[in-house]
Each structure stands twice: as structure tokens, then as C-alpha cells.
Amino acid sequence: MKRTIKNFLTGSITYFDTEKYFSNPNLYYYRIYPVEDNKTIKIRVSTTDNTIIHPEINKTKIILKIKILEDSIVRSLRKEIITNRNARKQLHSKGNLRYVPTTSRNPSNTDTYSSSIDISSSSSSINTSDDSSGKTSSNDLSDMSSKSLNESLTDYIESNPFELDKPSTTTNRISKTKYISKIIGVYKLNTKSFKTILNNLPNKHILDLSEFIQGDFLLSIYNNYENIFYLRNDFMLMNKLHTTIPLEINRNRLFFSFLFLLFYLHQNNYNTVNVELFNIGLSHNNSDKLISLKTIKGRRTVPLTINYEHGGYIEPILIDYVAMSNGQQNVFKLSNFMPFDNSVLYKNITDDIKYPYLPIDLIKKTFGTISSYVMENLCWIAKSTTNTEISIIDRQILYLLDMYDLFNGVPLSNNNITNVANYNMVQTNIIMNCHGDVSKCFQYNTNNLINDLDNLEVTILPPDNTSPTKLRMIPDDLKKLYQIYNNQYGIKIFGSIKSTNDIDIKMETFTRRVCLSRYWYSQLKNSYLVSRTILEDNYNFFEAFLDEQIDKLMKLIQQELYTIDGKFQVEIFVYHFLSLSTDYILPSINNFDYSNYLGESYVTMIYDFVTSIISNGNIRNKLFVFLALSKIIHLSMIRKLFMVFYIKENSNNNSELLQHGINNNKITMDKFDENIPFEFDANIYCQQRGLNINLIEYRYTILKELVPLKQNDIGTNNLGYYLFRLLDNNIKHTYVLYMYEDFKYCILGRIRFDKNKVPFKDYTYIPKTQDILYPKMDEYEFYKKNNEYVAFLDRGMDTQRMSVLDHDNIFIESFRQGEPVLSGASGHTADILLCAGYLEPSDSDRFVNKMKLMTILCVSVMFPRKDHSIFEMYRALQLFNKPMKTNEFTCPVENINTGSCFKWLLRDIVYNVGDNQLIGNQIYNTLTNRLNRSFEYYLSPKYYRIIEKIIEQFYKSTFQNININKFANDIRNIISDQQFNNINDELFIIMTIIRREGNKIWMNDAEYAYNIENKHISMRNFIDGNYSLPDFFTDDDIFLYEDNVITCTRSIYDFVKPVNSFDNTCLILQKIFWAASKPQCIW
């Protein structure tokens, strides 16, 4: 049999005798993953056991790296071959790194493998493996079509062995290159040959590579490593270290080895800028390896390998890694695979798909608890601006070595906590000795440390003001992108300090923000507890109420909207459900054409999942199914009713309606002959099904204005084309049907601040001295337009935004630059209320009560975060005033002033669903005390002065070291016993808010924009099931809930960092005040 790459990959029982490994999908697979230059395809071919793939390659793993055949690619490959080959020729050289060559189970086959020639008549191969004499074959590059490629790669290696990379010593050359996986073959491929390989690979779920498969390619084959990370076909980042190395202790040791390796490379001036996530791998060897690190205390030898339970050693390696000699030391650059910063970094797969590099939470899942703890602290050391007499790298190395000693059972030399570094070490020791639930163990033991802080001294520092105008928080490669946001929004709230007066302005802004946050915290917490109580006390009613709405939707879908010839089309329903309710790139149903059974099983599985939630899910899951069904109803029913309105207004040509299943006062998926009589009346259709024709007609008028506004996104400003053609081709654009804003004037709605749509000249600046009704305590830029309303720019809690104060004093948020859209829970609430409104005629006595009850349900289910504030829910309900020509959906001002509209929502409601009844006045009477609470004190000048004095403690003329307990008592003395029931309760909340606000106060506009967009990316990936925990799940802790209540106690579980910083000091104070307060959620 011809020894070709095709046969090498696909195997043959007559020659390779490995057919069982290639035909069994559980043993054999390949994957394709992206690289940055978009000119490289890497295919991983693997068996999952330790059997050989090929009799002449006695290894368990190979990788194929296929690149477009260009001059630069050939030069790069030459360089890689040189580096790889010279490393193997000099394995026994002496140096700081003790390296013992790897031996295979069949040594005679390891270094003498000679790949053969063609995979097609026009393909050729180069064997780049070095045998005992260091020779390489030079066959067949001469037939390359490009004149510039005539020189054989192998001839080049022999004649110019050191031309491209000349390290200063042989030792350095070895240390730099020995981690690279051995190249065992290089092939030239043409388009036909490449497609033949791909078509013959066993797995049929191949990605679309048509953009790559043109021209000639070079294919390199590597072996002898195990990748730790890989992407599933749905682009989810996975790791399999826990199966390769099952014990967490060994995985943590391996993590230390990776960091030791990076530090070693850094100390020896090797550039690791090319290291990325898929460069991380493992290799088996027979001997332990040590490397020598330089520290300020002298040299320290540390192990690079771990002993593996199956015998031999496992070492970390960098795969496909070529260290270019450009003199740069980029081992800690943020674009590296293991960033020494606590940001979650993302790398594009496509414009729409991203995966995380190596966020902290992924480290924890991959290596273990200790590794994530170490990584967090290395991040903080990298960000610290104090102790500059010791370099950041030196401090990181010392810290890592101390952690490694603790990890290996070296006892602490001093248990007396005198500084934050020592505090951190004591924490570490606790973690090392925790078993089982590490989180609970750590919380319990570290909280007890509060009693041992009598000798702890901290350096009192203000919030970080390290070169705030230099974009220090933004990765270098993104700074240009975000610089455009600097000074985009009027006066600088963020920015550098140039004088003492600037510091005073910063402190004033800081103080105002803390006061407003304190007000919001109590207001929102109170509202959440009320909504939760209403839902829990009336759970059976609300479940029956929601079931009734879902049942009506499902009957419309199953009996009419998704039928052809009267039969329910479950496949189309499932596809629409997935497409409209998830952000995933979904597999087309057509992908299952080759297997009807697989396709039907997939559809059945999804449909059963949806119906099981409807039947047995909890109320939260049911509500989100209702949200998904609302989008389906917009596509399958509301859209088609809009078609009827459009045809009636424009042409009276009913053939298009017949083609979309509209006839005989029914809406189905049938396609009627255009010659049959047409009969459809929207009023009769809605009346027969109990639908709200008034609301539907109003939404049609809104759509006519939305389509031109959205033309840049949907590709048309033609309403007819959008309804009849565009949605047939891309149902993702269904969202325009339920966009829910008065986008023209910002009254009773919101609009993103886009200077092209809301001209800046239309606004008149209002001096800060003028009285603004709400909110009183924050600093904004205020503008008026036509004396109709007040708008302001807020660099506030969430993002840069244009906001509007309307007549009921509820401020309306809107994100910058873009079209009007509700976001988060308020957007979900608007969609849910809109669908609920369709299902009840507006002349029904139940309509208003039904909309209020659905609002209460949304508040109760979706309220846990500040972004899901109750005021956002009211905003969604209030939007129904205009279509219903009423003011019944506006919460009265007197209720808003107390921070609660529940009295208004519940008043006079009597609603029956089967045997379940809700009487609003009775519910209100049980909650009177909580509903009538006011929190205006936190916006008063008196409270402002308290916060001002506390913040002043951090703004001293010089840095000062102070005992932490004395500092805590100084802060306690600012508040008198008469002002609060418990001083420690209040101070705990204050320090929590100050800590969070202090992380933002020195940002400039560009950094703030970067921070916000990263948060949105993190949230999206968290929702999609990714590995990274969004920063605001820990940083914005005062607005989260835990154990059935919104709590501000999550941050007390944070680790004290081994650095002196404003954040760290605030954290320790949080712990002190919490320990002295009530052991419950604090008001």
C-alpha cells in the first residue's frame, strides 16, 4: 500500500492494523482550532488510550499544522525546524536546566521515522526528523511552483543551521527550545490533496474550512505531547487535566511547574509573546528535572516535573513555541496565555465567538483551589504600586516560592500577624489544611482571624491614582481602540489629579457616589424582600396564573401557528425556539440529514425539555420559557398580522399572504394557491382568540418607525421587505418586532446617546447650582431640551449613558451610541408584558390587573440585581400608557418617594385563576410596615458629612502606617450611637460601598468604557455556561442576594491580598465591622 498522508491518517487493516482505533469514535477523534493569523489550521489527531497510532510513530498523540504556502510561512517553518532539530542534537549540554532526554517505549523507531513522499501526484514531503547523524532527506521541494520556494527546506537547514536564531550560548539555545514538541514530518499539499484528507477523516462534523482550502499548503506533523485545553465543536473551552491527572494535589504541583517555567524563561530573557492557551501541554519522561531561579535571597532550585502514578514523570511543555530573539521580555504581557492580571481576557475565534484565555475560575477548575488562590495574589502583586524597591517580578517569585513551601508542608515561621503579607500566608495555611468544602472551611477559619489582628499594621492609601491618564487598566493592544472614548461626554469626572483642588473634587464626587449607593442599597433591598414575600406567600396563585398564560400560547402554537395540513411541525418549532431564545450558533436541522434517527432524537430531546419545564419546572424556569414563547409568537403570529395591515395599506395583493399561511381567518404554515379566495379579518381573528387588537395595531405603528431606525442593523429600511423577505431569511431580526421604546423624544422611554440621533446642540447645559429633583446626591451634567424634560449624562453605576427625568421623577437609563432598546430584566419584563398584553383584550375587566400581576411576578423572579431594579420593571409597565391611552400604568409619585410602588400594584386587585385567588389589599395589609419605609436620610447633608469624614481618613498628605484596630476605632468615632441602631452594621455597609466605588473613582473615560464592555462580555459568557465568573459577581456584592436575601456580606469571604492597597485595607475593615455586627444580613 502506498505510504501517503491519507493512509497514514485513515489507516488500513492490511497495512497499519489500527482500523479499530480509527473506526471507534470513543477512541479516536480530531479537532480544528483557530490561530491568530487566520492562515493556519491545526488538526489534532488522537487516540484516548496509550496504544500506538502507527507502527513507525510510537507515540500516543500527533498534531497536524497546516498553513497556506507563502514565503513568510516557509521562512517561519525553516526557523521552527532549525530550533527543533538543534535542541534534539544537544540534549546533553550542561546548563542551569538539567534535562534528561525522553526515551520512547520503542527507541529504535523514535528518531528514525522517515515519512514518505506523495499523498497525490502533485504532493511532496520533507522529512525533518534528525537521525543519529543529524542528516535530513531533501526530496521533493524542488517541484514547488513558486520560484521563491525552490530552495529545499532541508538543504537550507544543512547550509544555514544558525542563521535565523543565534542565542548567545549553546546552553541558552537548549533551554529555550527543548520544550518544543518534535517535528516528525513536513508535507506539501495542494487543494485537492488537502480536501481529500479532510473528507477521509472519521469525524463527519467538520467545520467549514472553505475559506482556507485554496492554493498550496504546508503540513507539519508533531508528536509526544498531551494538550490540556481544547475546544468542543460548540466552541466551549474544555480541559481534560482532571482525567489525565486525577489528583488535585498533582494538578496543583503542575501549575507551580508552569509558573516556575515562565519565570525561568523571563529571567533568561526569552520572549514568550507567542505563547497562547493551546500551547500548554504535558510530556512524559523518565527522569526528574530541576530549574534554577534567581531570587533576591539567592538562587533556588525548584522541580519542573511531577511523579506520575503510572510511573515516570510528567513535565509541562510549550507546544509549537518558537522564541524570537527580539530582545523583548514579554512573559507577563497581558496577551499571554496566563495573564498576570485579574482581567478575563478573550481571543476572537470569529467576530461573534470568543473564548477566554485563562481566567481565574478556569484555573481553579483545571488545576485546583490552591492554584487559583496563588494566581489571584500574583495578580494583585502585579497591580500593586508600593514597595517599588523590589521589582514586581522578584516579589512574585518570592511569593510563589513561599506558597510552594507551604504547599509542601513547610511550617510558617511566624504566626503573629503583623503585616498583610503575613496575614495572607496565614490564610494560605488555612486553605492548605482545608478538606471537603474548602469555601466553607475558609470562611469559618478566616473569620476567626479577626480576633488575632491586634498587631496588624497597614499602610493607609487613597484609591489607586497611578497614572490614571495612561490607560493603565487597558491591555496595550486595545488602548488605541478605547482612547476614542476619552473626553467624549463633557466634563471630566474621571481623570488625573493636577492640584489639591482636584483631589477635593475627587473626594466630593466619591462622597456623593457613596451616599447615592447607600440609598439605592436599602431601597432595593427593601423592595426585593417585599417582592420575595409576595411571591412566596402566594406561590400557588402565581404558578397557576403563569400556567394559564403558557397554556394559551401553546394551544395557539400547536393547534394553528406551527401546523401544516393540521399537523404540528415540531421540528420548525424547536429550531425557532433555539434560534430566538439562545445566543449560541445553532446547528441547522439539515446537519442531521444523513441520520434521520439522530435528527429526530435531537428534536425530540429539545421539545421534551421545553414541555417538561412547562409541566414540572419551577416558576423561574417557566417564566423564561414564557419569554421564549413570546418571541415565537411575535415571529409566527404578530408578524403575520402586521403583514395583513401592510397589504391592506399598500396593495391589497393577497397572494403574499396566502403564501405565508394566512387565510380563512387562520394563521398557519400552509402555502395556499394564490388563485383561491382570500378571507381574513384581523378584528375577527383576534376576537375569536381573545387577543388584544388595539395593542397589536399600536405595535404596528411603532414598527413602521423602528424599521428605518434599525436599517444599519437589519439591512433595509423597507417595512414590506422586512416583513415578507428578511425575516424568512434571518429570524434573528425578529427582535425589531418587540422593541419597546418611544425613541423620538425620550419621554417615558430611553435612547442611547448617539450624537447623530440626538444632536448635542439640542440640549442646554444646566449649571450644577440649579436644583434637580432626583437624585440629589450625585454629580451629573444636566441638559434641557425644549423645556420638556431634564436629561443628564451619568458616568455612574453601570456605563456612560444619557438619562432622562420625566414627569414622575423616575430616571431612565440608556446606553451610549446606538438605537433604543431596553436591556437586562427591564427588557425581559417589557417582552413578557407585551406578550401577556396580547393575550387579554383591552376592554376586559381583567386587563389592567393582569398586567400589574405579571409585573409583580417579573419583579419577584428577576429582581436580585441592581440592574434588575424594581424601577426598571415599573418602566416596562408604564410604557403601556400610550398604546392603551390611559395613565393607569404609572406609579403615583407618593409611592415612588417611599421607594415602593407595591401598594399601587396591589390596590383593589381581586383575581381568580381556577381555585386560586389573590386579594391585593389583604397582601398589602400584611406588609404595611415594610412598604412605608423611607430611605431619604442617606441623601441628606447630615449623612453626606459622615461619609465625607470617613473618606478623609484615606486622603492624608503622606502615607502612614497604622494599627488596623486603631484605624477601625477612629472610623467608629465618626458615628454616634444615636444615629444608628448598630454602628458596626452601618460601617460594614459603608466600607463595602467605599471599596467598590474606590475601584472606579480614578478611571478615565476610556478605562471606564473598557471596564464596562469587559463586564458585558463576562456576563454573556457566564450566562452561556462559560467558565469565567463575572467580576461584578464579587465586586458589586452589595446588590447580590444570597440565602434568600440580598446581602452585602459576600466580600467578607474575599482573601486579604499580600499587598498594601486601598482595596485591601477596606476589605480588612469590612471583616472587622462584620465580625462586630449582627450575624445576619445587615440593613
Curated annotation (Swiss-Prot):
Residues 93-145 are annotated as: Disordered. GO terms for cellular component: virion component. Keywords: Virion. Residues 108-145 have a biased composition (Low complexity). It is found in: Virion. This is Uncharacterized protein L389. It comes from Acanthamoeba polyphaga mimivirus (APMV).
